[in-house]
């Protein structure tokens, strides 16, 4: 499988502060790769280095088998799309007019604009001026712009952070479809549920360092344990870990016919993040 992104021993410092520490990973063609961590962990810094907006302090970063800084060259820009918190939209014109302007840069037909608007569920609102939009709608417009030219590689920095559940699910479905059509996706998020829904593989980033990397199911198997929820006849619920001393108590409840129901609970990706890093994902 072709490697789209290859990062080796990446370092990034801002004056006396080291934001990224010895980060290495690679992303294969067709993956949805989640870069997960709390605010301030280095996610946005990494995405800016990968797209050539920032220069690394050390290490090697290659995208499409070229130095990442080459993505800032006009010839490379048609190969990737990016969504960040900086919209760069023209606020005094409509959603549709913004996308039509960008479509001209890629020599695209007007139908590509219609398709992108439907992708983000904004076709009916296409005539609205950007300066009248909510934060969530602006985020959807910038996502439409990022996928307008059906890029080979899509960088998404917290893509659903300002969206309601309905539009979030709509975007999830669209991203899966885009991925099925061949787009590789690099996704940063602090939403572990989002990562579980979308990502083939994830990396846990904590204080600028990757603490674990792998498929969500593999990370759960490696670091997590299922628990049992025991519901008693008196209405109480008890959580019991596998191999814990509480198992003896559970068998006593069962022998005394005190148990109404027992269910198995799989750890969430958020639980695994806490297990690996020792901190909550905030």
What role is predicted for each listed range?
Residues 100, 104, 110-126:
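Conserved ABC ATPase "signature" region
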Residues 59-69, 75-76:
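Conserved ABC transporter NBD signature motif
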Residues 51:
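Helix-to-loop junction immediately C-terminal to a conserved catalytic motif
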Residues 218-282:
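Short, charged/small-residue-rich alpha-helical element at the C-terminal edge
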Residues 154-157:
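Catalytic Walker B motif of ABC-type/P-loop ATPase nucleotide-binding domains
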